[in-house]
């Protein structure tokens, strides 16, 4: 029997944080101050845990990893310390724990001493048929009390955690610092990116969420540089360098030398995820959003997915896809590149078994493919986590009559090995860490063999919104 989902209320979180600072039983040296911890790059047999220290006077402490919450029968995993100075802490260190040889489809717990208890929790995936839930959303940079603050401490993160997803896909605007500065020397801007991340991960509700839910994080403009930042932004190299050391991620096939896009590919069960970078290679003058190298990579990966006959492909594209040609939002200014991708998807007969997960627009809206003239696949816009409402793009076939702050979505997959059922569902935070499904944003695909079919959804008679109504 599987164990119940990991839960840690606020008071216990503060208690555990205090215990986290303990250095008894050989865990940490006196004066060390662990600040944050998050997990990513999860597979069926491995994961990566990163821990940030304001300073680390002794050697990197080993991580205790166990399948038990009390860390009994734990194995010891040594960490690799990487100097990562920030604007506010010259002695800041990030310790990477590369966890390998894990059992598939198993829940793991980690901490630094037996007395500290569980500080991180994740579940490995499985190869072959595997049922899971992935939550996805974007745009978190405000609170109810301070709407224009740079970071979020909203309880929307508690609401997502309550659904117990296997992974959270953050599609950009992790914060709204809109950093800018001289490109060289690199260190000052890198330090500012790291200080921004430290502030995000010091927010109570986000900190707790990322300790129990692995992340897949792709930046957008406000957390990559200033508003509408692209390849020409002086922040590009600093953002790329800090991402490599401070963010848990899957292999970066185009960025091995810290100079390419942070494009990633991974599988959860029989679902193939392709994550594209919409900022670091965007060149408006050349009318390319992906850049030549990333565009070629995506064409190749789409072909590989078709050849591998994966039942479902999830393309994480951080910006709106369904926009009018020439529209300044999302793909509108890159219509030729978008059309070429649409033709490739159509020629591979992938349209029925591809879903796009998108952010940037501060709205919750799905399209069943009827308004997607470039590929005809399902598109799911999800957000804002904690930001003002600002719709973009469209029309969309499935959209609520009103938009609110505190919105996110889930991709729930049930896979029998013969039939894979994928359900996209929008959710809205009600406050106090509770959420409700938004009935207008629900789509379900039934996939078997090389085809997926849309199932009757609510509302079945959803009509497209009038064209030309987006800002």
Predicted regions and their residues:
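Metal-dependent phosphoester/phosphodiester hydrolase catalytic core
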Residues: 4-471
